[in-house]
Amino acid sequence: MLIKYCGIRSKQDIALIEKSAATHIGFIFYPRSKRYVKPERVNEFVTDEIKKQVSLVGVFVNTPVDQILEIASVTNLDVIQCHGQETAADVRQLKQRGYEVWKALPHNKETLQQMHVYEEADGYVIDSKVKEQFGGTGVAFDWSFVPQYESAAQRLGKKCFIAGGINACNIENLLPYQPGAIDISGGIETNGTKDYTKIIEIERKIIL
């Protein structure tokens, strides 16, 4: 299973990730997010060791393409995650610059259709739909839909990350639906700080 821990903001967070089973880590470049990190700070705490262990994902919300590309270059991103209302043309333009691009899609009755609209993306992040919020809500959606999303992504040859409200207390309810990838932020935090105890608790349940 692919595991993305999102909202990484410090040297302390990186130290925890180095001991984890993460395959991807996410940096939030959306100024209105409580987990926002300035792009210039990322290079201060991202080590060569962690770059060998995980892929670096930048999360953007309605950021102009030229600005995304500038930040991606400065922070040496592997993946660009479009988490707002970016268009299929935006995704195409980013891919043309050589980046892996994921599109976040809210869970609703149109999600499967939207997966086809954004079929040029390399992957999807299926998240909860909360009015006027772009991810990081701590709210889970109805996971019985996960097999449909997984099946659609497999047919299109894409990664499919399940996000929204996943934590150590409920991940056992998600696992029977066999997600191929998960994206967790608040679920590995205590009082807004990444918590290694919660990381271990989640990973033990995944492995078992």
Swiss-Prot record:
According to its UniProt entry, the protein's GO biological process terms are:
L-tryptophan biosynthetic process
Q: What is this protein called?
A: N-(5'-phosphoribosyl)anthranilate isomerase
Q: Spell out the Gene3D superfamilies in the cross-references.
A: Aldolase class I
Q: Which organism is it from?
A: Priestia megaterium (strain ATCC 12872 / QMB1551)
According to UniProt, this protein's pathway is: Amino-acid biosynthesis; L-tryptophan biosynthesis; L-tryptophan from chorismate: step 3/5
Protein family: Belongs to the TrpF family.
Q: Tell me the SUPFAM superfamilies matching this sequence.
A: Ribulose-phoshate binding barrel (SSF51366)
Record's keyword terms, sorted: Amino-acid biosynthesis, Aromatic amino acid biosynthesis, Isomerase, Tryptophan biosynthesis
Enzyme nomenclature, EC number: 5.3.1.24
Recorded catalytic activity of this chain's protein: N-(5-phospho-beta-D-ribosyl)anthranilate = 1-(2-carboxyphenylamino)-1-deoxy-D-ribulose 5-phosphate
Q: Which domain of life is it from?
A: Bacteria
Q: What class of enzyme is it?
A: isomerase
InterPro entries, sorted: Aldolase_TIM (IPR013785), PRAI_dom (IPR001240), RibuloseP-bd_barrel (IPR011060), TrpF_fam (IPR044643)
Tell me one GO molecular function of this protein: phosphoribosylanthranilate isomerase activity
Q: Does the keyword Cell membrane apply?
A: no
Signal peptide start-end: none
